[in-house]
């Protein structure tokens, strides 16, 4: 909801566009929430532009002042979200899987906005799942309750936890911390008290923070929590 005060061209928007302005929206929060649809969001941003506001009073932080500044921010925000929406749909229609799209879709420099709240990659995934649902069309296993980590655990037992842990450590050292986490989690499924695997979890999450995971406060909070959890 927008409360508009025409005498001063002021819009009171609370957290309508998120707590950080102008940052990419969180179309689905890490804390758990219903998916937020792109089209109503874009309509809201355009409505604010049409009002030609001079002051925005958000739900957090100080008021934002200046008609030219506000319109420029809103224009860029609208363009950024619209771009990600269109690029995601184009990728879906081309048969590209969601994880590839999450990796490949980036904002052009002229549409760059902050990602301290929502992230482009998360927006891509939410848009994909809003249209397609939870079935990613990649594997029959998606239709059943068995988790991928269970299969990874079987492979860890087959090759041995020490060999698997060496590979995970190598992945951390070669800047592939996400893959290292996958393997370390499988090891810990087989041997919950495996100290080297726990150390890999700490190192991998530290690496993710260093690689930009500290930009989004949602992501940095989760990564730091995991570091504390696995520090033994």
Write out the residue ranges for each language-model feature.
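Metallo-beta-lactamase
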Residues: 1-94
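C-terminal regulatory/interaction regions
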Residues: 90-232
